[in-house]
Amino acid sequence: MAAAAAAVNGSLDRLDVHERKAQKSYWEEHSGELNLEAIMLDSRAAELDKEERPEVLSLLPSYEGKSILELGAGIGRFTGELAKTSGHVFAVDFVESVIKKNGSINDHYGNTSFMCADVTSTDLMIEANSIDLIFSNWLLMYLSDEEIDKLVERMVKWLKVGGYIFFRESCFHQTGDTERKFNPTHYREPRFYTKVFKECQTFNQDGTSFKLSLITFKCIGAYVNIKKDQNQICWLWKKVNSSEDGGFQSFLDNVQYKATGILRYERIFGDGYVSTGGAETTKEFVEKLNLKPGQKVLDVGCGIGGGDFYMAEKYGTHVVGIDLSINMIMFALERSIGCKCLVEFEVADCTTKTYPDHMFDVIYSRDTILHIQDKPSLFKSFFKWLKPGGKVLISDYCKSPGKPSEEFATYIKQRGYDLHDVEAYGQMLKNAGFSHVIAEDRTDQFLSVLQKELDKFEKNKDDFLSEFAQEDYDDIVNGWKAKLQRSSAGEQRWGLFVATK
């Protein structure tokens, strides 16, 4: 047994040596000219950098006076920006000419230090619990899976509790147009990185365990704007005590919207959709918005992105889709690859997310805001984010006026919903400042759509069971029948709301 383990370890070590040689050779070839185009491997580097660099910096937590470890620092595209307000930046890169160039550009800040080292090397010794922010941009894609596993564990140990890790990678495929003799880059699916970081757990000397909590996960908007490419993806994680509850996001991803659960829902709602009526109601409702090419749309609770792709492809709009569920955004990003449209996705909590005033022409939300307890505050945010003349369109679960039955109240509590009657819902939009508020009870349409979805689903039972279990089938059928019963009884309602700023 021990001999077998030693043989496996020896084999991995040889693979790691080969990996490091290949990556070093690759970067020595592409760092002959120490300029932006060479480092970004793209002829449009200057154009991309102008939009992308401030975007990346805007995604970071406050680092004023903080200690920053920058891994794979390159010629210092971010080093100088970080040094302007941080306490100290320790920049590391494994190509000597590159890190020397970085030092010559950024040493004058007086709070920077530079080291030529490979991040996988044990020679890189950082004191435990000493770093506030670990930053890397295009680093992990040049490491093997095994090297990433080891590095993540070390990074978590280096971080202070409450400290952050930010990293950005090229996923799925190459983006830069620079010609390459060979390319050892690992263009992974983003779910690989999410899994590795999410599952990492470390312990301090007294046995207390720590994990990483996901704060942000999104594609870089600059690459969507300029190249219509969603493969540039970044993550922001926070080091927390392992006993910390994951909150509502954890409930969504582990209970209501597990990966298999999302795929189940998609089978009844239709390809790309996880909300009532799928493509049919999307087309009907979106038509009410009079969308024009170039307009910017925010989709709150975007799910797996079907409605966003539809708006971007049919109307030429730029759509920003946000959802609290990591699983939803993971599917949306995977499906965006190759679409070549202006759609970007982000894991975000709409109750804490901020946008500049007057940023969007339309805010769109389908059967999502039922999860939000403080709707008045959210609607005030919507009002601020919209341009004058902008529209909001919301479909959502509602209830009848008055006190719900004991059974319906239990259902609402179990799901964590906050439901209002249609009139009260519309009044909240008016109170937030909106004009021309249309509040329609669409329960009859809801019943019709539910029945149509159920009939089609039952007809395709054998097809569904070829991929899913009988239990999954029963859950869907029973869930739809229960919704039909609650809505037929007049308890559960479905509202459509359109309003203008």
UniProtKB/Swiss-Prot annotation:
It is an enzyme of class 2 (transferase). GO terms for biological process: methylation; phosphatidylcholine biosynthetic process. N-methylethanolamine phosphate binds at Q256, Y257, Y265, Y397, Y411, R415, G416, Y417, K483. GO terms for molecular function: N-methyltransferase activity; phosphoethanolamine N-methyltransferase activity. PROSITE patterns: SAM_PEAMT (PS51582). Pathway: Phospholipid metabolism; phosphatidylcholine biosynthesis; phosphocholine from phosphoethanolamine: step 1/1. Induction: Induced by salt stress. Down-regulated by high temperature. It catalyses: phosphoethanolamine + S-adenosyl-L-methionine = N-methylethanolamine phosphate + S-adenosyl-L-homocysteine + H(+); N-methylethanolamine phosphate + S-adenosyl-L-methionine = N,N-dimethylethanolamine phosphate + S-adenosyl-L-homocysteine + H(+); N,N-dimethylethanolamine phosphate + S-adenosyl-L-methionine = phosphocholine + S-adenosyl-L-homocysteine + H(+). Its EC number is 2.1.1.103. The keyword Heme does not apply. SUPFAM superfamilies: S-adenosyl-L-methionine-dependent methyltransferases. The keyword Transferase applies. S-adenosyl-L-homocysteine binds at G72, R77, D93, D118, V119, N137, V274, S275, G301, D323, D349, C350, R366. Keywords: Methyltransferase, Transferase. Phosphocholine binds at S170, T175, G176, R180, Y187, Y265, Y397, Y411, R415, Y417, K483. Arabidopsis plants over-expressing maize PEAMT1 display enhanced salt tolerance, root length and silique number. Belongs to the class I-like SAM-binding methyltransferase superfamily. PEAMT family. PANTHER family: PHOSPHOETHANOLAMINE METHYLTRANSFERASE, PHOSPHOETHANOLAMINE N-METHYLTRANSFERASE-RELATED. Involved in phosphocholine biosynthesis. Catalyzes the N-methylation of phosphoethanolamine, phosphomonomethylethanolamine and phosphodimethylethanolamine, the three methylation steps required to convert phosphoethanolamine to phosphocholine (PC). May be involved in root development. This is Phosphoethanolamine N-methyltransferase 1. It comes from Zea mays (Maize). The gene is PEAMT1.
